[in-house]
Amino acid sequence: MAKSHTLNPEEEFEEESGLRPSLLSEFIGQKEVLNNLTVYVQAAKNRKRALDHVLISGPPGLGKTTLAGIISNELGTRLTITSAPVITKGADLARLLTSMGENEILFIDEIHTLPKKLEEILYPAMENYMIDLVIGEGVTAQMVQIPLKPFTLVGATTRSGLISEPLKSRFGIQLRLDYYNDEEMKQIVLRSSKILGVLIEDDAALEIGKRSRKTPRIANHLLKRIRDFSEVEGNLSVKKNLCLKAFEKMGIDDLGLDGMDRQILDCMIDRYKGGPVGLKAIAVVVGEEEKTIEDTYESFMVRIGLINRTPAGRVATEKAYRQLKRMEDFSVHHGQDPTLF
C-alpha cells in the first residue's frame, strides 16, 4: 500500500502503523463488520471496479483508520489520508479528488465536520465521478465539469448524527464499530505484545485489556507504559501483579477510569448532587472542552452505566457512586438511609 499524507501534518497513521493489522484476517473483533466488508471487498476485486463509498462510524480508537488501510491493502491500491478540519477551501478538496488514481482510496477522518459548501462538491464526485468548478468571477464566471477517475471515499466519524442526510445517503456501505469485549481486548494486547517483543502472561494481558476502556488504541498505549515499568524493574516478562501496581501508580482503576473521569463524576456529585447537570457546566468546572468530554470520557461512562443522559442533563448513576466509594453521598442525595450502604 502506498500512502499519501495530503493535508495531514500529524501523520498519526504512521506513528501507530506498527501495531495496526494490515489485512482483514489480522483484525480482531467486530465480526459482523468484518464478515460483510470481506464480501464487499471481494466483490469489488472480482468486478475490477472501485468499491462503493464507505462510511465508518463509532467511538474514537476502535479502528476506523485501520480499516481504511486494510481496505486499501486488500484491494492493492493507494490510500490517501486526510482530515475534514484541515480541508478549508474548495480548492483543497478539488486538488485531493483530481489527484486520485483509478480505484484508489481517499480517507477523510471526522467527515461530520466538513462544511456544507464542501459537501456539495462531494455529491457529484461520489455519484458520477465529476466535480463542478466555477472558473472566473462575476458575469464572466463559468461552470466547468471536470471528470474524475473512479475512486472510493472512506469517511470516518465519531458523530454520525451530525452528517447531513444528503451526504450520508451517498455512502453505499455504512459500517458501525462498537466497543470490544474483554476477550477481544486480551487478544489485541497479546498480538501487540508479540509485535513489540514483550513477553506477557495471559492474565496480565487480560488485566490490561479490562482497563483499556474497551478500546484498542488505549490498550496499545497502556501496554507500552506497562512495558516501561517491567523493564525498569528488570522483569523478564509482564505479570499481573506488576500490572496492578503500575495501574495504581498511573491512577487507572479496574474499570479503566482515570483522573479526568473521576473529576467529571466528582463534579456531578459534589456540585450538583449527582445531577441532572448540563455538559457546558461540567466542562467549565473540570476545564476541558465539551467535545472532548462528550467523545472521550462521557461516551464510555454512559456505555458502562456510570452516567445517564436525560432530557434535563447528565445524571451520575448509583454504579458511579459505588465505583467512587461514595454511597453515603448517594443515600443523602436520594433520601435513603446511609446505614443501608
UniProtKB/Swiss-Prot annotation:
Pfam families: AAA_lid_4, RuvB_C, RuvB_N
Predominant place of localization: cytoplasm
GO molecular-function term, one example from the UniProt record: four-way junction DNA binding
Annotated positions binding ATP: L19, R20, G61, K64, T65, T66, R170, Y180, R217
This protein's UniProt keywords: ATP-binding, Cytoplasm, DNA damage, DNA recombination, DNA repair, DNA-binding, Hydrolase, Nucleotide-binding
Region (Head domain (RuvB-H)): 254-341
A GO CC term attached to the entry: cytoplasm
Catalytic activity: ATP + H2O = ADP + phosphate + H(+)
Record-linked InterPro entries: AAA+_ATPase (IPR003593), AAA_lid_4 (IPR041445), DNA_helicase_Holl-junc_RuvB (IPR004605), P-loop_NTPase (IPR027417), RuvB-like_N (IPR008824), RuvB_C (IPR008823), WH-like_DNA-bd_sf (IPR036388), WH_DNA-bd_sf (IPR036390)
GO term, biological process aspect, one: DNA recombination
Region annotation Large ATPase domain (RuvB-L): where it falls in the sequence: 1-180
Catalytic activity, EC: 3.6.4.-
Enzyme class: hydrolase
Residue positions binding DNA: R309, R314
HAMAP family: DNA_HJ_migration_RuvB
Quaternary structure note: Homohexamer. Forms an RuvA(8)-RuvB(12)-Holliday junction (HJ) complex. HJ DNA is sandwiched between 2 RuvA tetramers; dsDNA enters through RuvA and exits via RuvB. An RuvB hexamer assembles on each DNA strand where it exits the tetramer. Each RuvB hexamer is contacted by two RuvA subunits (via domain III) on 2 adjacent RuvB subunits; this complex drives branch migration. In the full resolvosome a probable DNA-RuvA(4)-RuvB(12)-RuvC(2) complex forms which resolves the HJ.
PANTHER family the record matches: HOLLIDAY JUNCTION BRANCH MIGRATION COMPLEX SUBUNIT RUVB (PTHR42848:SF1), PTHR42848
Role summary: The RuvA-RuvB-RuvC complex processes Holliday junction (HJ) DNA during genetic recombination and DNA repair, while the RuvA-RuvB complex plays an important role in the rescue of blocked DNA replication forks via replication fork reversal (RFR). RuvA specifically binds to HJ cruciform DNA, conferring on it an open structure. The RuvB hexamer acts as an ATP-dependent pump, pulling dsDNA into and through the RuvAB complex. RuvB forms 2 homohexamers on either side of HJ DNA bound by 1 or 2 RuvA tetramers; 4 subunits per hexamer contact DNA at a time.
Domain text: Has 3 domains, the large (RuvB-L) and small ATPase (RuvB-S) domains and the C-terminal head (RuvB-H) domain. The head domain binds DNA, while the ATPase domains jointly bind ATP, ADP or are empty depending on the state of the subunit in the translocation cycle. During a single DNA translocation step the structure of each domain remains the same, but their relative positions change.
The protein's name: Holliday junction branch migration complex subunit RuvB
Organism classification: Bacteria, Pseudomonadati, Spirochaetota, Spirochaetia, Leptospirales
Protein's gene: ruvB
